[in-house]
């Protein structure tokens, strides 16, 4: 009993030290747990495809039989996927890449001049906008220099008065429409005509009219013949 009491007495003063040590251990354990949690998070962020690499490998083996060259490690597979991402990623073309100038500018630049020698230094070509501004400034200065023409003099009082109405003269050179029609009627029948005395609708008379038209008019009327009555004044 004495020995046990002595042992207990000896252990009692050591208790606060052990408690401090236990606290230290707990603090160290907490720091270690935090470090482990950080490591776990870090490992998860880096190896997010650790479980799905096998499925990716099986898919590549099915669709791309020759793709087993980069299947030795996850790093090679990851680099291969990154290369595919960069290779097949869409490239957005800007108007500057296609046309050589930005689309926000309404003025199209002039085409480049002929290539100069290699030894000579290339001078910066002035832009079309600067050229047009200079031309506009020159034109405005020239307009300012030109004197304005004097205003026209006011018209005399005689011209400002309204003109008197003119009496209408005889129309068509003093002739009426009936006189003009009578004068023009004989000229309408001056072309050669063919008179058909017999029945027009008979085949024989129509054939005779065609023959006579060939002799007089020198026209072949066999393809189409159109006959109508035309009043001809008797001589």
From Swiss-Prot:
- As stated in the Swiss-Prot or TrEMBL entry, residues carrying the post-translational modification Phosphothreonine are 185
* Residue numbers carrying Phosphoserine: 52, 89, 198
The secretion signal range is none
Region (Disordered), start-end ranges = 1-30, 109-167
Q: Bias regions of kind Basic residues — which residues?
A: 1-13, 120-148
User: Is the keyword Protein transport in the record?
Assistant: no
| Pfam families with a match to the protein in the record | CCDC71L
What residue spans carry the Pro residues bias annotation?
149-159
- Give UniProt keywords alphabetically: Phosphoprotein
Provide the protein name: Coiled-coil domain-containing protein 71L
Source organism (scientific name)? Homo sapiens
């Amino acid at each position: 009993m004495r020995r046990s009491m002595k042992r207990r007495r000896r252990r009692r003063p050591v208790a606060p030290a052990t408690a401090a040590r236990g606290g230290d251990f707990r603090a160290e354990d907490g720091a270690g747990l935090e470090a482990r949690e950080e490591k776990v998070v870090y490992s998860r962020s880096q190896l997010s495809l650790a479980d799905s690499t096998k499925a990716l490998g099986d898919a590549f083996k099915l669709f791309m039989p020759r793709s087993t060259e980069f299947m030795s490690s996850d790093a090679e597979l990851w680099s291969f996927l990154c290369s595919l991402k960069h290779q097949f990623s869409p490239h957005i073309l800007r108007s500057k890449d296609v046309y050589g100038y930005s689309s926000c500018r309404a003025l199209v630049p002039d085409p480049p001049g002929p290539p100069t020698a290699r030894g000579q230094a290339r001078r910066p070509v002035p832009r079309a906008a600067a050229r047009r501004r200079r031309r506009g400034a020159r034109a405005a200065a020239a307009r300012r220099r030109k004197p304005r023409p004097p205003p026209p003099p006011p018209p005399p009082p005689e011209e400002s008065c309204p003109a008197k109405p003119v009496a209408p003269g005889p129309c068509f050179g003093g002739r009426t429409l009936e006189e003009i029609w009578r004068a023009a009627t004989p000229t309408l029948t001056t072309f050669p005509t063919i008179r058909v005395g017999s029945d027009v609708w008979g085949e024989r008379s129509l054939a005779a009219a065609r023959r006579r038209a060939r002799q007089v008019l020198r026209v072949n009327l066999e393809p189409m013949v159109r006959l109508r009555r035309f009043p001809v004044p008797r001589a």
